[in-house]
Amino acid sequence: GILLFGYVAGARSRHITMNGPVHILLEEEEEQTENIEVKPGEQIEKSAWITVEKSEAKVQVRVKVLADGIMAPQQRDLLENIQMDENWFYCEKDGYFYCAEKLCEGKKVHFQAKITVPPKWKEWTEDLQFRLELAADGV
């Protein structure tokens, strides 16, 4: 089976990234409870609010979806199966999703990714266990 780790009931995780004078806050809320088993073709949702806490100029917010516990080819499989809304675009060169609109201090934007577990993963015989995390910063 394929096990997705680290979904905590009603947990709100907060991460602040400081890149010089730019401070970005990422807040995630998860509805699921414990580790869940996912099947090939199933959809996983990851969403977060991203706030520009501090910045002198308008900043472009970017988010990386990190998959821990699986190899690079499987990570690529997952990233190829992500659907985003039209406010975000993916840059293959660096693996980040960029917000189309630049934000000024105090503004927040919603990031929501629908990730489909690759259907070809059903050919795997060994168990897969992984965790999905989001990381945000501003450029």
Whereabouts are the PLM-identified features?
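Surface-exposed, hydrophilic segments of mature proteins
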Residues: 1-139
